[in-house]
Curated annotation (Swiss-Prot):
Localization terms from the record: Mitochondrion
Protein name: Meiotic sister-chromatid recombination protein 6, mitochondrial
Domain of life: Eukaryota
GO terms under cellular component: mitochondrion
Transit peptide range per the UniProt entry: 1-29
The protein's role, per its UniProt record: May be involved in the control of meiotic sister-chromatid recombination.
A Gene Ontology biological process term: DNA recombination
Major localisation: mitochondrion
Keyword Disulfide bond in record: no
Keyword terms, alphabetized: DNA recombination, Meiosis, Mitochondrion, Transit peptide
Length: 709
């Protein structure tokens, strides 16, 4: 197989770039001139007949044993129907639309398997079938994986990537991930070079980034790669280097980590080679914030805080402590009084003693305290502290004032005119806080649902366009368009198409992959800011026009539980629709995603029960848990914690003098039936939970395995 040394690599990539430009020109020319070598319908039909015939032969008991002879026969038959005899030497028949032939896919699956015993060389097969235009990204993915994981030949992987670039004009995240791993495994490397890797991956050409998230997934799923310490060290170095050069991008990557395990992987890799005395405090606090966002009960934010708190400069340490204040405000507690006590302990122990030190901005501390008191629900204490304890000089600070005004808008009944009067009295001018702009705009939408003038004036006065491609501002503008355009004669308004237009207007040169990612992020924020479930349902109904990604589907599903006018039964209908294909069978992709969808259902219903104390919903929760075996999903500790939390909240609410029958039956279900539903799930109950089940009246409470309280 051809091997490319690093000295020739850049030249090869330039050649690939030339081929890309050349193919673009050829496609333009061919749009007006019909090629003489187009495959005729008859020839295409014969190709599919061959595919069906040889797929059947390969499926026979002796098919894999005879794979070499089958392939040679298939190739001979291809030659018979090819157009090489037309005198156009070197021009292959255009089977480009047939790159997903099942026989070729299964052929590559077999010959790139670690247990393959045939003499067929995957590279030779790829070369031969490329002449017929029958090789696509899927086959390249299999062969790159083979040379990386089976053959441990990183230079060959890079050679194949260059060959792919010569043939195709679109990027492929999996191929880029395999190529990056191969680059990191090159034997003659000292330290990874970001610019060199970006040239190899052609990130500028494709308007993409190094696919770190995909690389992490590939490494974590392969034991050999996981145990490769040199690879781990080089990858950690590369990630740190790239994060330093592209901090905004890296923070966005943390924002789209939707599982605690993925975020933990990013943190472990980021911190592996990071000098703790030279860390980026914004990234560290972002890790804390995101861990808390994904799991409010997670102890990991405190672990991060304790790891860094004594090793930072005064200024950076102060920012870390501000992050702690935010985490504590969101951490679950039996009452808002206990949350208040925790917040004041952090304030008095960590933050107030820092005032007066060089580089310490007390206004940030007061703004953070206001935000934390608001988040924890202690609005009365917040107003008391604002009036009596915050010095006037800080009340006149725009950052502090906007934090206070945001809390007032979210926690009290205040009109838009009253809000505007407060803003006008300060003489600050344009708003700085995106969150405040969002809260005010939602107030405007609520008060002026039929006239866009007030919103348009507010938008212009504060120059919200100056925030550029800010996700929240674009989502806000989209929600405004939804509110006002759907109430006019514009019946063709499509939410996702509107967002796409906004993104492409701001970034006309953006790649398809990148604009789709931005559109999805804006739609996620659109779902978050929508105060009602109605626009979210409209977005779901329009999914046939714009394909919603899996994250959006989960968010739409969860909105039925989270929005005040959401409906549990409608959530169940959406769940059923997402899980079914046209023939009403669960598809393979949805089997892979079903744990996350099921987790969304469990989390959502638990939140509704905890919020409403509606014990009539417990049978529904039992039904969800009983569905797990049929979906091939296992119970998780995180789900169990959420379930137990709802039981505690209802039990301690004291809303009824007697224990509700539904609560008793559900408690018995958890103790008696859940172990049979998932025998592999072994949960250690806390002593106080066992005591709670006893007080509820669950007769089988003594069967529970306990751990410390």
């Amino acid at each position: 197989m051809l091997r490319i040394n690093q000295r020739l690599l850049v030249r090869s990539l330039r050649d690939a770039q030339y081929q890309y430009l050349k193919s673009t020109a050829l496609r333009f020319l061919s749009s007006s001139t019909q090629s003489n070598v187009e495959t005729t319908p008859r020839r295409s039909g014969r190709l599919f007949e061959l595919n069906k015939e040889y797929t059947g032969k390969l499926a026979q008991p002796d098919g894999k044993a005879n794979i070499e002879s089958l392939y040679n026969e298939f190739k001979n038959d291809l030659d018979k129907i090819s157009e090489f005899s037309n005198g156009r030497q070197g021009m292959a028949p255009k089977y480009g639309r047939s790159r997903s032939l099942s026989f070729i896919n299964r052929l590559f699956q077999s010959i790139t398997n670690a247990k393959n015993t045939s003499s067929l060389d995957p590279y030779v097969v790829l070369e031969q079938l490329s002449k017929y235009n029958l090789i696509g990204p899927a086959q390249y993915e299999m062969i790159l994986r083979y040379y990386l994981l089976v053959k441990d030949a990183p230079k060959d992987v890079i050679s194949l990537w260059v060959k792919y670039l010569e043939q195709f004009t679109t990027s492929n995240e999996n191929l880029m991930a395999y190529t990056t791993i191969a680059y990191l495994k090159l034997p003659d490397m000292n330290e990874p070079d970001c610019s060199m890797l970006q040239q190899i991956l052609q990130t500028e050409r494709f308007h993409t980034d190094i696919p770190f998230g995909r690389i992490i997934s590939i490494v974590e799923q392969n034991e050999v790669l996981k145990r490769d310490q040199e690879l781990s060290n080089r990858f950690a170095y590369l990630l740190n280097l790239y994060a330093t050069q592209n901090k905004t991008w890296f923070i966005n990557q943390l924002d789209i980590c939707y599982t605690e395990s993925r975020l933990r992987s990013f943190y472990n890799i980021y911190s592996a080679q990071r000098d703790i005395n030279n860390c980026d405090i914004e990234i560290i606090t972002k890790f804390m914030e995101q861990f808390n966002k994904l799991n409010a009960n997670s102890s990991f934010p405190m672990q991060v805080f304790n790891e860094y708190k004594d090793k930072l400069s005064d200024a950076d340490g102060f920012k870390l402590k501000l992050g702690l204040l935010d985490i504590v405000s969101k951490y679950p507690a039996p009452s808002k009084i206990q949350k208040l006590q925790r917040l004041l302990a952090v304030w008095n122990s960590y933050l107030k003693p820092e005032f007066g030190k060089v580089g310490i901005d007390a206004s940030l501390a007061y703004a953070s305290l206001i935000k934390a008191l608001n988040t924890s629900g202690n609005i009365e204490e917040l107003q008391n502290i604002w009036e009596k304890e915050i010095p006037t000089e800080y009340k006149n600070n725009q950052v502090v004032f906007e934090a206070f005004l945001l809390a007032i808008i979210r926690r009290t009944k205040i009109t838009y005119s009253q809000i505007q009067n407060r803003i006008d009295a300060t003489k600050f001018g344009k708003l700085k806080s995106v969150d405040l702009a969002e809260a005010i705009a939602l107030k405007i939408f609520n008060e002026n649902p039929n006239d866009s003038k007030v919103f348009d004036d507010f938008y212009q006065q504060n120059s919200l366009d100056s925030f550029g491609s800010n996700t929240s501002i674009l989502a806000l503008k989209t929600y405004g368009d939804y509110i006002y355009k759907t109430k006019t004669d514009d019946e063709t308004y499509v939410i996702a198409n509107d967002v796409r237009s906004k993104v492409l207007k701001l970034k006309p040169q953006i790649s398809t992959q990148s604009w789709k990612q931005e559109v999805n992020l804006i739609l996620e924020k659109f779902i978050d800011i929508a105060p009602s479930i109605i626009p979210v349902r409209v977005l779901f109904e329009q999914r046939g026009i714009y394909q919603l990604n899996f994250t959006l589907q989960k968010k739409i599903l969860f909105s039925e539980f989270r929005k005040p006018d959401g409906d549990v039964q409608n959530a169940e209908k959406i769940f059923e629709e997402l899980m079914k294909t046209d023939n009403n069978k669960v598809s393979q992709p949805m089997r892979i995603n079903s744990p996350q969808l099921m987790g969304t259902m469990i989390k959502g219903l638990c939140q509704v029960i905890g919020r409403t104390h509606d014990v009539s919903l417990y049978p529904e929760l039992s039904k969800y848990l009983e569905m797990l075996p049929g979906l091939e999903v296992h119970m998780s500790i995180n789900w169990m914690e959420q379930v137990l939390r709802t039981i505690r909240m209802v039990f301690r609410s004291g809303s009824t003098k007697t224990i509700p029958k539904e609560l008793l039956e559900f408690s018995e279900f958890i103790i008696e039936k859940l172990p049979a539903i998932d025998p592999d799930f072994n949960y250690q109950f806390r002593n106080d939970d066992i005591a709670m089940f006893k007080k509820i009246g669950a007769k089988s409470f003594s069967k529970l395995k306990s751990t410390s309280t």
